Amino acid sequence: MKKLTKLTSLLLAGIMALAMLTACGGTGNDAATAKFEAKAEQVYMAKLNDAFGKEFKNDDAIKNLAVKHIEAMASKETLSMDELWAEEKLTEKTQNWVMICYDVSQSNGKAYVKSSYEAGKAETITPDETTIKAFLNLAQMKRGQVGNTAKFTALGVGAKTINGKTYVAIGLRVEG
């Protein structure tokens, strides 16, 4: 009986230690992180809606593509122009495009440094005007590739926290 009690105590201590390690692991999936990511998405959506002069909702497909693209590029310190963008072809004339937001002041046209926010340190989330303008210019280029009559029909923003830094990718749907 004594051995069973000791074994039970050891098992409970092990389970508690694992629970503590898991809780303190900082995986970036806790409620505060999710709240910060949602706030970043809202701020960027508002800025994009202002730029387009329309009231788009955050499109789920574009948001998911944005988050997947952030995850795919997370390990890279800098990105090339091709790595900055991701495309998802829905049909021959309908495409979703996303761009990871980057720090214009640290980028040189060949290597783009991803911009990020740290939830504990960021008092406000301010989308960089130059990045938004670059996105709009490149979006016009992408629209031209689809066709002269192509239109932007949806916008989306995805945010993902990786190793304590929250990255944002913005995107649109082009239909021609």
Language-model segments: what does each one mean?
Residues 19-23:
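C-terminal motif of bacterial Sec signal peptides marking the signal peptidase cleavage site
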Residues 29-100, 155:
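Short, well-ordered surface patches within globular domains
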